[in-house]
Amino acid sequence: MKKILDIDDDIDVLEARKIILEHSNYDVVQATTIKVAGEILESEEIDLIILDVMMEKDSDGFNFAQYVKMNEKFKHIPIILATAVNQISKFKFNIEEDGNFLPVEKFMEKPIDPDDLIATIKGLLKE
């Protein structure tokens, strides 16, 4: 069973995604901080990461994505960047224009449609 690391500081979002992911036969580990996410990444075999961009308590998701992709041990792990940044800030992110600067495989805007999420995961994991 493929293992997904889901990182978000919103516990409600994590719980909703966990139900969706487990229903689709994925093993899910969760982190509400970047620090905990790093510890999980070091100790478990992760197949895919879902990462919130704007984390309130820690370094943001952009920095964590760069850490993952610059590390030989983890750079093969696909990352889905999940965010509401376009809804809650004046910063407007456009994946077509700005995506080349991000070390992630997919950008998905919250709220994420469950069917789109599963289809994206299957595509990234080549299932």
Question: Where do the language-model regions lie?
Answer:
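Short amphipathic alpha-helix used as the core "switch/output" element in two-component signaling
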Residues: E39, F62-K75
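Conserved acidic carboxylate
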Residues: D8
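Acidic, metal-coordinating helix/loop segments flanking the phosphotransfer/catalytic sites
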Residues: Q30-L48
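Two-component/phosphorelay signaling modules centered on CheY-like receiver
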Residues: I11-V29
